[in-house]
Amino acid sequence: MAETRKKSLSVIYNGTEAWSELFPVMDRFTYTDSVDQSDTISFEISDRDQKWVKGWIPERGDIIEPCIKTENWNYEGERLTLLCGSFVVDDFSFSAAPLRGSINGVSAPVDSCFKETQNTKTWENATVQMIAGEFAAKYGLSLVFDADDIQVEKTEQSKQTDSDFLKQICEKYGLGYKVYAKRLVIWDYRRYFAQAPILTLSPDTVRSWKYHSTMQGTYTGVRVSYKNPKTKEMVDVLVGTEERLYKTNQKADNEAEAKLIGEGVLLKANRKASTMQITTPPYLSLTATRTVRISGFGRMDDVYFIESVKHSITRKAYDMQLQLSRISECSLKQG
């Protein structure tokens, strides 16, 4: 007789196991693993006995560490665990009747200044890794830097939060960043686009799908200028081709930086050129920043970058919703 598929959660709340208290009242748990935004979690509960609203009501700043577990899902004897990370409770609400609650958390440093306090500072003769390392140390995070380091002659943070400024620096050079499990992770999109697909999805392995392709807001090339240190003249560098040219006011310090800035502009814009939204059963190996092969969908077949994964778990069901971008549409075409 085939083993029954099983799903469960482990939840550590402020350092204490809490799943035994959450399980009887939980209606839905969602976990969104995203490239462009902080990861989030949400618990929807039915508080019929008023335990949460009277005695266990959460506080903003509480720490939740959930973990998803599955058994026998893809084959008998399979046991998988997905560590969702560490989340700060940033929002909760209760309503009646019936008495229901929602507890929401975001993956971010416990110190809210990272996303709330505006700062001004100038960096000179720095690197992206050096700047990221300073922020990681400031907020008690470990730094994971999965990219070639980039020299930054001079850059200014002007009345910006540390989070916004770091995102600006990363996007400028075609890098991504997120806070996950008390780590500040930075990666190079070019490097991650080149990864081998972690899994192949076909029509019989998905529950629903939608494909969308657009030219609006996408570009074939961009011009970035820099000043020649010898002649003092401005030099234009074309990245890509001229068919649909993006106009940017960003200036570079040299030719190499101009190319990186141009690539960053195109990588950010063209990730929305061709996209797929797919709902699947749980494949815990599929995480944001990985790649997946789409096969059996006709002309939509290709390798895609996973932009986000939303896990939705109820007592009866477990679905994953994938947001994908077509890597061949993001690739830089040279004239």
Protein language model regions, located:
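Conserved "cap/hinge" positions at secondary-structure junctions
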Residues: 68, 188, 296-298
